[in-house]
């Protein structure tokens, strides 16, 4: 086992705080509408330019191991806030720095670290309650667009495109972000349920222009096994032919004689049929077939529930207004399922989302909710260079997370104002002893830090602006973008409550751990081995003169 280097007390905390300051100073330069860019070196290719706090934090590793520990703990604050709320990483870092710096000073002055921590926790708990009190639910598209705009570093086009996407696919809908091919941002919306399986034979195509098979008001047969014998399909095909409607078959596989017969029937115009493979594999395939059954008001023909394909009738089939099948995708639009049954199914999947511990499973379950509840929107990010594309895509993803958080817990006035209002409301708190009361004061002072940093980045005097904001009430604050005072909500400067709350709670959690740290252990630096002695020179070659 390698030898360890151990630091105690003040020496340990001083080094840790030094690391915190290095990371926080780099991250906080990006805060606010007039925040600066940070350039990150890459091992190959052009450097990355970003205004995203968590991207900056992730790049920082310090040479001194004790300083690096401090930096990594604050990095944890940024990452945790990003995971919880999707944004607010820079705010969380600024809060953590302020709490740690003041807390370390108090410990150095002889105060009890545990009492300081209790005081900080007490103040944060009261501030979170106050944040929830001043929070307002987001009900309209305008508020959603404003939240997205602020999170995307005041880029209105991003805020508007996210609001439009949410309007089209609903609050539960899946919105994905991809790299586009143009210069402008684009929005593609797929309404209804889409899955990534196309037609099994090109002979099913009936729309030559789009090279797709379009079915209007079709019946939908859902089967969880292979179909190779056409006799099994005859009762269903006869019923559909009598009704004069097209048919979509979704099964594990349609092959051989069955597929050939369906193609011949389609070409001759007897019955318009399209066959596709069922999406997914194993249990996920069964679940997705059940989703389709609920959406279309049909039944999955499965031996597990005692239904055989040859016994199936037209009553077991689902319905939809329209189905479009391309080479790679199938889209079911406006299924005829019962809305109460769909809601119940969505609720069931949401329960599974809460219970699962796998990120992959959670993502797949959320996709299923979206397909049942609304649809899927794809935001294609446009930019003129690859560097700009990466930076812009990161901002769009941030803004999307922030708007989801706003829909979840509502919004508070932005620009650091919500924390200032919360600290004024809980300003008369006192602890059980003097040290706890000092801990409360540290937390209250730290809650001013985000506003101070936004103002400093805008080139103004933080204390002057802060006092003026404190004199106001409610949503009154400072718009750093244009230097005006006024109602932050009217200015469109909003923060999701969840983002502000998570930033404060995570910063307090890490600050409490750091203040109460008394020893730090790291690997001792290895001593450099002495270099090999230089080799002797080659002997002269006698008798040769130059």
UniProtKB/Swiss-Prot annotation:
Domain of life per record: Bacteria
Molecular function in Gene Ontology: ATP binding; ATP-dependent protein folding chaperone; isomerase activity; unfolded protein binding
Annotated stretches, region: Disordered: 526-546
Catalysed reactions listed for this entry: ATP + H2O + a folded polypeptide = ADP + phosphate + an unfolded polypeptide
Biased composition (Gly residues): 534-546
Predominant location category: cytoplasm
Keyword tags: ATP-binding, Chaperone, Cytoplasm, Isomerase, Nucleotide-binding
EC number of this enzyme: 5.6.1.7
Enzyme class: isomerase
Free-text function comment from the UniProt entry: Together with its co-chaperonin GroES, plays an essential role in assisting protein folding. The GroEL-GroES system forms a nano-cage that allows encapsulation of the non-native substrate proteins and provides a physical environment optimized to promote and accelerate protein folding.
Assembly and oligomerization: Forms a cylinder of 14 subunits composed of two heptameric rings stacked back-to-back. Interacts with the co-chaperonin GroES.
Identification of the protein by name: Chaperonin GroEL
Species classification: Bacteria, Pseudomonadati, Pseudomonadota, Gammaproteobacteria, Lysobacterales
Name of the gene this protein is made from: groEL
